[in-house]
Each structure stands twice: as C-alpha cells, then as structure tokens.
Regions:
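Acidic side chains
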Residues: 6, 51-52, 95, 141
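Residue-level detector of secondary-structure transition/capping positions
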Residues: 29-32, 52, 61, 121
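Short hydrophobic beta-strand motif reused across regulatory alpha/beta modules
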Residues: 46-51, 135-142
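Alpha-helical structural elements
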Residues: 63-64, 117-119
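Gly/Ser-rich helix-loop-strand patches that form or flank binding pockets
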Residues: 120, 124, 138-147
Length: 148
C-alpha cells in the first residue's frame, strides 16, 4: 500500500502572512510555484494559489495571465490589467489566501487521499505532521508519478 510520503513533494516554498502581493508574485514567477502555504507565528494558516490571485474579488486581472497546469503564461499587458494589478499590490498574503484546503499525514493511504482530492474537488493536499508543513501533493505530482 502506497502512502502519502511515497509521492509528496517536499521541495516546498512557504511564505509569511504579511508578505506583500508584489513579493508573492515575484516568488511565484521566479520559482514557478503555484501554491504557497502561508505561515503565521510558526503555524499554517492558509495557502496562496495562482487562482486566489486571479479571482481576487472585483480586482482580479482578466487574463493576460493564464494558468495551465503548473505553468503561468503571460499574455501582452494592457492598461486595464496594469490598473487592476496596481490595486492588488496593496494586499498581503493573509488578505488573499485560501483557508479551505485538504490536510493529510505522511502515513495516510495514498488511494484514500486521491479519493478525497477528487471527490472534494481539491487540486492539492498539504502534508502536515506535528503542526509542521512537510510537503504537498498536487494533481500534477500524481500524474507525473503515474508516468515515471
């Protein structure tokens, strides 16, 4: 029986709850990270994803940024996009993070976790042990493991 630890990605970038929007974008762009767990006082409090940024209230930039799997594709910018992006730059991680995410343990049965991800319509699960984030499992990770 495979466990979460067999497929989880431990190469994880976390951010602080007070990190600015501009720095979040910089990390996502430079590191290719689409999901950034948010830590406050050593505790996991949320996750900032590309989707959180793209659909943030009425200020969401309409794509010139397209999310495709774990890739960000930037299209030519326009004035409206720049205006919306500037409005978002006043936010910090805790303003835009999701607090609805699936938490699993390294020892959890992988088949059960996959079922939870699919049935509950999550794109990922965070691996947490003793209140510490240890890794992440994304749908992309699962597909890659199937073909390796």
């Amino acid at each position: 029986m495979k466990q979460v630890r067999d497929v989880m990605n431990t190469d994880l970038i976390t951010i602080e709850a007070n990190l600015t929007f501009d720095n979040i974008l910089k990390i996502m762009t430079e590191k290719g990270a689409g999901k950034l767990p948010v830590i406050d006082n050593g505790q996991l409090v949320g996750v900032v994803t590309r989707d959180d940024i793209l659909v943030r209230q009425e200020t969401a930039p309409l794509p010139p940024v397209i999310a495709f799997w774990d890739l960000l594709i930037t299209l030519p910018e326009n004035k409206e996009f720049k205006k919306k992006l500037k409005k978002l730059s006043g936010y910090i991680a805790k303003d835009i993070m999701s607090t609805d995410y699936l938490v699993v343990k390294q020892s959890d049965d992988l088949a059960n976790v996959i079922t939870q991800i699919v049935e509950q319509k999550y794109n990922y699960a965070l691996v947490v042990e003793n209140d510490s984030i240890e890794g992440i499992i994304t749908k992309t990770d699962l597909i890659k493991k199937c073909f390796n």
